[in-house]
Amino acid sequence: MSTPKDIERNIEFEFVRATENAALNSIHWMGRGQKEMADAAACDAINGVFDLVDIRGEVVIGEGIKDNAPGIFLGDRLGTWKEDSPRFDIALDPIDGTSNIAKGMPNSISVISAAYVPDGQENGMVNIPSFYSEKLAFGPQISEAIRLRELAPITLDNPFEKTLIVAAAALNKRISDLVIVVLDRPRNQKYIDIVRNEGASLRLIADGDIAAAVAPSLPDSGVDLYVGIGGTPEGILTASALKALGGEILLRMWPRDEPEREELLKSVSQADLEKVYTTDELVTGESAIFCATGISDSPLLPGVKLVGNTATTHSILMRARSQTVRYIRAVHNLGTKTINLRSIKRETNV
C-alpha cells in the first residue's frame, strides 16, 4: 500500500512537467501585448498534462476569476479521476505576471502547488475567498532569531516601522541595509513611504509577487522582506513554497470596498475576515508540493532561453515533508519536443 510519501514522490515530476509545458507554450506571446492569449496558452498546456495523469485533483485556488481571463477555475477537476487514484488539492497560477509577459518584462513564472488529501481528510489547503490580501513574507533566519533570541514577534497588526526594526535585529543588519520588495500599486503607497522614510532599500515590482514573496526565504536572493496588498491566490501558493523552505507568510483578507466586505461576510465570519493566517494555517499537513518554471527572468528563476533549435527551462521543485528543494534545468529539442494540449486533444510540437 502506497504511503503519502510514496505518492508524492511518484507524482511530483508531473507537476514540473505541467509548469514546463506552460512556460514553453506561452513564451511565444512574450512582448506581444496580449496577456489573455499567453494565459490561455499556459492553461491549455497544464490541462493537457493533467489529462494524462492518474490523480483526482481539485482546484481549490485558481486564477481565472481575478484576472478576468481564460483560466483554470475554483472547483475545476484536473487528472483522470480514476476511482483509486490519489486525491490532491491544487492551487495554481498558470502565469504569475501576465502583464509582464505582455510587455516583454521580467518576473513571470508558471506555478503549481498541491497537497495530498488522504481518505477521511477534508482538505489540504485553505480557500480564502477575498480577491486581495495584506501579505508579509520573511525567511527562516528571521523566524529562528525571533524564537531563539526572544525578539518581538512580527505581525500584520504592528506598525511596519516596528517590523523593520525587528527584521534588522534578527538579521544583524542596520535598517538601511534591509531590502524590501513591494508590488507597485497605489494601494501599497503606505508601505512604499515607510520603507523610504526609514531608510531601507526599496525594490518595486510591476507584477508577479509569488517570486518576490518566496525570495526572502532563498539564500543569496538579496531580499529580506516582502510586504503589501496583492492577490490572495498568490499568497496561498507562496505559503506552499515557504512550507518547504521554513519561511513564513502572514496573510489577512483585504476587501477593496464596503460592497466587497459585505459580500465576503456572507461566506465568512467577522473574525475570519480579520484573522491573520500563518503558513501552517494556509497549507495544512506536511504533504505540500510546490513547483514553478521561469517564463521570463525573476528573482526566483531564470526564464525560458531560446537558442537555435533548443529551449532551456529552469524550474524549482519543493516538498514540505522532506524540505527538499530541487533546481531543474531542462534542455528541450524543439525539433522533437511535443506537448499535449487539451484544446486539440493530442500531442503537438512546441
Regions of interest found by a model, annotated:
Residues M1-A22:
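N-terminal hydrophobic or amphipathic helices/low-complexity stretches enriched
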Residues D39-G120:
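Flexible, acidic active-site loops/lids enriched in D/E/S/T/G that coordinate Mg2+ and/or position polar
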Residues S2-P4, I11, A215-V350:
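Oxyanion/phosphate-interacting regions
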Residues V117-L204, S298-K305, T310-I344, T348:
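Acidic beta-strand-loop-alpha-helix segment within the catalytic core
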Residues P94-K103, S108-S110, Q189, I210-V214, ...:
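Short glycine/serine/threonine-rich phosphate/pyrophosphate-binding segments
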Residues D84-I95, S99-K135, G139, L171, ...:
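Active-site-adjacent structural elements in enzyme catalytic cores
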Residues R17, S26-A38, A42-G48, L52-I55, ...:
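Alpha/propeptide regions of enzymes that mature by internal proteolysis
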Residues K66-N68, R187, A206-A213:
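Short acidic loop-to-helix transition motifs that present clustered carboxylates
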